[in-house]
Structure formats: C-alpha cells, structure tokens
Amino acid sequence: MKKKVINSKKAVMIGCGFVGSASVFALMQSGLFTEIVLIDADKNKAEGEAMDISHGIPFASPMKIYAGDYDDVADAAIVVISAGAGQKPGETRLDLVNKNVAIFKSIIPEIAKRNFAGIMLVVANPVDILTQVAIKLSGLPENRVIGSGTVLDSARLRYKLGEHLSVDSRSVHAFIIGEHGDSEVVAWSSANVSGVPLSEMCEMRGHYKHKEDTAEIATAVKNSAYEIINKKHATYYGIAMSVKRICEVIMRDEKSILPVSHMIHGVYDIDGVSLSMPAIVGADGIESDIPINLSGEEALKLKESADSLKKIMETIEL
C-alpha cells in the first residue's frame, strides 16, 4: 500500500472567526509553516483574512497564506478546527454543545473523505466534548486528535501566580486539569515555582494567607473568559498563543508536557472520556499521560468533572 504523503510544512485552519484568524496570525509569525490554508463557510471571509494576514509576510518569513477548500486538508500536517458558534455573554461553554456538534457533523466527515493522516487540533468549544466527537467521526487514532483543553487556563493560572508572587510566569509550574470550563480543577498539590512548593514560595514572597489568595486566583482564572466576553464580546489572543504553542510542540516533536484535551484511559480511575490532563506531546500527537500528584480532594473533583462530561457525551447522537 502506498504511504500517504504529508506536507510537513502545511497547516489548515477551519473557521475564520476571531479565534481562527488570530491563530493564523500567530502561526504566520512562528516560522513553523510555509503554507497555511484558511477554510470557512463564508469564502469571502476566508479570502479577506488570508489577504490581510498575508500582507504581514514581508515582516516574517516566506510562505503562502490563502483561502481554500476541504481538498486542501489531504496532505496537511495539521488541521486546526476553530469553527463553531461563539460563547455569548451569560452562556457557558457547555451551552454550545448542540450547536457545535451539528457543525462538527458537517466538518469532520469532509476531512475523513480526504484520508487526512496528520494531527487534528480541536479548538472550538466545548473543546472536551468536541474532541471526543472528532475522534468518533474522523476515524483517526485517538492519539492524533487533540483538543486545546486547559492549555490556556493553565497559562492564565501561571500568569496570575507570577503576578501575585512577582516572579517570571515561565518559572511557575502549575496545571489546571479536567474540563475546559466550570468544573475545571486546579492541581495545587503539584504546583511549584522552579521546584519550590507553591505554599513555601508564597511565604518567601511575603504572602502568608496563601490559601485565601490561591482560592481567589483560581476563581479569577475560571471567570476570566466570562469577564473578557462581557467586556469585549470574545476571547482570542490568549487562545491564539495557545494554538501556536501546541503546534510548535507537535511540529518540532518537542515531547513537551501540555494539559491538552485527549482520551483518558485508566488515569485516576477515569476511562473513556476526553478531558485535559498533562501529557507528553510530540510529532505523533499524544505519547503518554503524566499522572501528576493530586490530593484526595483534587482527584475527587477531577472524577466529578469527568463524570459530568461523560453524561453529556451519552446524550449526543453521532
């Protein structure tokens, strides 16, 4: 059987709304690709975004950015799916389930028809549900279908902790796991700053009410998307940087550990559901889970998060 030929420098973005367009803009500056294709139900929108972003190429590196169609996914290394109804003020990510599952039912089979053999990155919300939907509809191996998950939530947490402690957020190691949404869990038990446990670091920096402070930070992180949506109607810059980072890890085969959404089997007594847990990510997608230390309470909350997602999946007909 002839081996499928993949263009390792080609990416396809499906969905050219705020998130898709901002992500392409970030990817254009990354140097990862020489070809980026934009696909949208509104062809004019895709063409306009491609034209606008292309005008920045002289300040980046040579590449082609253009509007295309589903035939362009055939040889792509990675397909990013941001298409879907956006979250409106007052809505939760899970409120988007039925609308966006219907959209995925029209998108994923079109990708499957082209015998796509690269990595599929799901960004649309609710990302955990849609990642599992994409796995079922695409026929791709589970390790090659990844959701952006809590990569952005974890970045928000690290940013807030860095700000609180007056340290570089890149030195903060902390994960949010579970659902990318209201049942997300902060893994405080494993949080540290360059190897120093978070509680110790808080006291070293003069913060002695660290339980109250961290609870306040966790709430701020969980509610940040709602706050941004209320103020400017959509979030897109943070997730665009998250998409860029995930693509870097995949395209460079970095084997970095990221809290992406993927199918979980047997970790913390969770099985058969897609949610975010730290995993080693490389050129072939998910390599293995990293079962970080959790307290009993954190493990229980994670199981509750998984159970809530499972119940929603059981209501979806595919």
Please give the residue ranges for each predicted region:
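A short, basic/flexible loop-to-alpha-helix module at the beginning of a structural domain
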Residues: 1-9
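Glycine-rich Rossmann-fold phosphate-binding loop(s) that bind the pyrophosphate
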Residues: 16-17
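Conserved S-adenosyl-L-methionine
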Residues: 29-35, 139-142
